């Protein structure tokens, strides 16, 4: 039976833009992938040769494609170039000769043609340009005229012949018999030569072609031919017209253009040949010229990029948006590739079931199964595909760090790590945030910083709802749930949950000082301390004066090189001087918030305050759907849903931990084992004693100028000063009432909203504050932890105990300004003041008689009740 050949154009399916629009996304993707598989099978049988065309009988000369001659451009090519889909491929930098080759044969308009323009095929095609130029033409001393009439073979040759000029050396590589295969894909039939055995062997990782020089194996005959040239280092293919040598026949197939009218240009510097457009771009590398210079940067666009495309990098024009996640792209090709993540159309490995979004990633992964891993580490037994990776891995065992920094002498294993480290010394921060303008040394740091603006926290804790922007923060948080402390100190056996804390702790035992001063030889534990010390020598060289004397002449103040301009006090570090200067500038608040107008004395406090306005609140709580942050959500959920399995037998109070129950039982036992050595005050818990002892030991350097009260923290002083100044920066949006503290405003707003988040589990009563709920629970439990030391009477609230103790002491702190009468309670004073003001707030509804206090009204109403009872 005679073999019948069918061209691709006969079996191809033509689709218009209207046909593609009718196909859905899922059907279109299925059609695309199936067509791609068929197309790749065809190209395995007969790789494309875009540079030369010939008839099978060899009667006609080779014709240059449209890429080299304008006369050869067909109408199909022109029509294809103008299509919208082709514009995307030209923007991607695809070879014009490839597209025109496909269009000329009617290949682009078929379903197989479109399928070929895909990531995997084009990446392999463009990544190895010489793969397009491989030819089976053997040049055994033939003239250039004879070169043009060579026959392009339509099948795979059973013998691969390589000629080396005068001394020819032939490698015979046997290939398996080609058998015709019939396919019925896409409602069409076609015959093609396919080597199923060879294809299966490549998939299984077999490499049947072996080099006789070094024994290296290859999966294809042409790869063996290319490898064999590396042994001879000769150029076996010689062009007879100019006697110029080439490494491959493919290079020779391109070179005749210089003799047949095609204009190729040779670089005088390197001797490399180029086409006209490529030669112009190459010359600019020598002259330093940067055409098409962007107004936004000093970098010219690459030669394969149009100026319009280069401007998109500065204008940030991203007109293609993803409907799933809202991410924007500059090209529709990037959007299509991104959408595969949402559709979950994944490619699975048949051996290890690993999945990938792109086919090319699957092919790269399959090479790990097929490749012969001959490089093995003798230390740990790890296997590598390449010897270079093994050498790099062995440096870890040997501790080698060949790349050294010239500034500090620090060494690194990789050159890329050294370059990133050198940016610390040069101050280069190429990665800049578009939101706030902050710059970073590394791109990964910029990505982590952007999550502050977007609120994106991909790393979630499985135990609670808390999420984190960095995996290291998640690991540190998970140690709270597991209570695991895997890092142990070898000296004292103390354990830590974080490796950083262990490193800091070990410095206490070793007392190593790795940082040494080059001037005086003094060593330090921290690098920051060394920098602070080096500034002393820098000031000495500049002749810095303190109180009219040079530092060298005053050894006591040698390291106090930072001087206050107001009181002339000196300090050893700049941070100490900054803290000291706040004493002189106290009350001055130059940093003002743009949102609410609040002013601060320090820039760091302003930044911390601005987070209140820019805070992302992604969670809702309560029936009204109030927006809260993740931290607030955790506190609310832990309060309402936390289990309390440990119950007190005395009062019935429950606890989440047994340690809390043990501490609580000390209240009923009356034990106060922790006693202060200075004031004999006792406490039930050790942490309370530690906090109390700080009141004796710690100084209070911050003094209020109005009343002389001292404070330990500036924030406490600022809150206290609002009492004297009457400042109330927090204003209620409902009624306009102002408050001095933000916590007071939050509690007040619950009156308007009616929110009562704290609910009693016993009776269901709700409260606006957690402290009110705690006091209310004592009604059910009968707990009265506050006991009077004089009479032994117990109270549920501390305020009640304070009022009761005034009976024993006779203290009456509330006095009337009119008559001077004193009272124990402020409520009694308010009632007394109504005597002077004649104010009557409580009125009887029956006789309209008014009273100053509610108790008098209640006694009066009993009169009406008795009269009604008598009637």
Swiss-Prot record:
The protein's name in its UniProt record: Zinc finger protein 473
Gene: ZNF473
Organism: Homo sapiens
Record remark on domains: The C2H2-type zinc finger 2 to 6 are necessary and sufficient for discrete Cajal bodies localization. The C2H2-type zinc finger 5 to 10 are necessary and sufficient for interaction with LSM11. The C2H2-type zinc finger 2 to 8 are necessary for interaction with the SLBP/RNA complex in the histone pre-mRNAs. The C2H2-type zinc finger 2 to 10 confer activity in histone pre-mRNA processing.
InterPro entries per record: KRAB, KRAB_dom_sf, Znf_C2H2_sf, Znf_C2H2_type
PANTHER family assigned to the protein according to its UniProt record, in alphabetical order: ZINC FINGER PROTEIN, ZINC FINGER PROTEIN-RELATED
Residues in cross-link Glycyl lysine isopeptide (Lys-Gly) (interchain with G-Cter in SUMO2): 148, 419, 549, 558, 635
PROSITE patterns according to UniProt: KRAB, ZINC_FINGER_C2H2_1, ZINC_FINGER_C2H2_2
Pfam family, one: KRAB
Domain annotation KRAB: ranges: 6-75
């Amino acid at each position: 039976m005679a073999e019948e050949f069918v061209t691709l154009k006969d079996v191809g399916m033509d689709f218009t833009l209207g046909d593609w629009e009718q196909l859905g996304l899922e059907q279109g993707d299925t059609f695309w992938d199936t067509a791609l598989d068929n197309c790749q099978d065809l190209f395995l049988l007969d790789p494309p040769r875009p540079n030369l065309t010939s008839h099978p009988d060899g009667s006609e000369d080779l014709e240059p494609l449209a890429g080299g001659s304008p006369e050869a451009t067909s109408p199909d090519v022109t029509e294809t170039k103008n299509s919208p889909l082709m514009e995307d491929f030209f923007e991607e930098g695809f070879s014009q000769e490839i597209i025109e080759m496909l269009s000329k044969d009617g290949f682009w308009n078929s379903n197989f043609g479109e399928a070929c323009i895909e990531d995997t095929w084009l990446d392999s095609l463009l990544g190895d340009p010489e793969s397009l130029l491989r030819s089976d033409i053997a040049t055994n001393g033939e003239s250039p005229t004879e070169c043009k009439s060579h026959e392009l073979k339509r099948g795979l040759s059973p013998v691969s012949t390589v000629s080396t000029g005068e001394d020819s050396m032939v490698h015979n590589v046997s290939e398996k018999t080609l058998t015709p295969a019939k396919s019925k894909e896409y409602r069409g039939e076609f015959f093609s030569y396919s080597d199923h055995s060879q294809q299966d062997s490549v998939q299984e990782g077999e490499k049947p072609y072996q080099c006789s020089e070094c024994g290296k194996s290859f999966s294809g005959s042409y790869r063996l031919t290319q490898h064999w040239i590396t042994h001879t280092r000769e150029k076996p293919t010689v062009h007879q017209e100019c006697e110029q040598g080439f490494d491959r026949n493919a290079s020779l197939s391109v070179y005749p253009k210089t003799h047949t009218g095609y204009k190729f240009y040779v670089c005088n510097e390197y001797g490399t040949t180029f086409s006209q457009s490529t030669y112009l771009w190459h010359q600019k590398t020598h002259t330093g010229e940067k055409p098409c210079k962007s107004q936004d940067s000093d970098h010219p666009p690459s030669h394969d990029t149009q100026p319009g495309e280069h401007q998109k990098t500065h204008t940030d024009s991203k007109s293609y948006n993803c409907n799933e996640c809202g991410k924007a792209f500059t090209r529709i090709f990037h959007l299509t590739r991104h959408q595969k993540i949402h559709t979950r159309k994944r490619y699975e490995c048949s051996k290890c079931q690993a999945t990938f979004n792109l086919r090319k990633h699957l092919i790269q992964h399959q090479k790990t199964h097929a490749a012969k891993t001959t490089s093995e580490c003798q230390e740990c037994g790890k296997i590598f595909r390449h010897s270079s990776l093994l050498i790099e891995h062995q440096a870890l065992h040997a501790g080698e760090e060949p790349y050294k920094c010239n500034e500090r002498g620090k060494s690194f294993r990789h050159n890329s790590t050294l370059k990133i480290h050198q940016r610390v010394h040069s101050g280069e921060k190429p990665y800049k945030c578009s939101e706030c303008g902050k710059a970073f040394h590394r791109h990964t740091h910029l990505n982590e910083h952007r999550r502050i603006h977007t609120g994106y926290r991909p790393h979630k804790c499985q135990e609670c709802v808390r999420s984190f922007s960095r995996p290291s923060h998640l690991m540190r948080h998970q140690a709270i749930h597991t209570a695991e402390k895997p890092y142990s100190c070898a000296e004292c056996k103390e354990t830590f949950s974080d490796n950083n804390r262990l490193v800091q702790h070990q410095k206490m035992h070793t007392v190593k000082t790795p940082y040494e001063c080059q001037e005086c030889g003094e060593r330090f534990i921290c690098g920051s301390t060394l920098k602070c010390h080096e500034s002393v020598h820098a000031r000495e060289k500049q002749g810095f004066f303190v109180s009219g004397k040079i530092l060298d002449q005053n050894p006591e103040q040698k390291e106090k090189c930072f001087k206050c301009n107001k009181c002339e006090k000196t300090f050893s570090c700049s941070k100490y001087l900054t803290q000291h200067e706040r004493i002189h500038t106290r009350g001055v608040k130059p940093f003002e918030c743009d949102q609410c107008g609040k002013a601060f004395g320090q820039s760091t406090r302003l930044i911390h305050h601005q987070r209140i306005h820019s805070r992302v609140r992604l969670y809702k709580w309560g029936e009204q759907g109030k927006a809260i942050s993740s931290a607030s959500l955790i506190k609310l959920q832990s309060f309402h849903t936390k289990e309390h399995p440990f119950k007190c037998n005395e009062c019935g109070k429950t606890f989440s931990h047994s340690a809390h129950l043990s501490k609580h039982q000390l209240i009923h036992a009356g034990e106060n084992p922790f006693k202060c050595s200075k004031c004999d005050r006792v406490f039930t818990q050790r942490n309370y004693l530690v906090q109390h002892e700080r009141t004796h030991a710690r100084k209070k350097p911050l003094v209020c100028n109005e009343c002389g009260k001292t404070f330990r923290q500036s924030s406490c002083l600022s809150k206290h000063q609002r009492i004297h100044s009457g400042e109330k920066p927090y204003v209620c949006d409902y009624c306009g009432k102002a408050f001095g503290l933000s916590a007071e405003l939050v509690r007040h707003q619950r009156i308007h909203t009616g929110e009562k988040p704290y609910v009693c589990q016993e009776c269901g009563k709700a409260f606006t504050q957690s402290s009110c709920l705690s006091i209310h629970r004592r009604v059910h439990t009968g707990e009265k932890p506050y006991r009077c030391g004089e009479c032994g009477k117990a109270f549920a609230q501390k305020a009640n105990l304070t009022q009761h103790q005034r009976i024993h002491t006779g203290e009456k702190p509330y006095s009337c300004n009119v008559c001077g009468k004193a009272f124990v309670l402020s409520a009694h004073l308010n009632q007394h003041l109504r005597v002077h003001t004649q104010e009557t707030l409580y009125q009887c509804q029956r006789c309209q008689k008014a009273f100053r206090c509610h108790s008098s009204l209640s006694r009066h109403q009993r009169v009406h009740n008795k009269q009604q009872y008598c009637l």
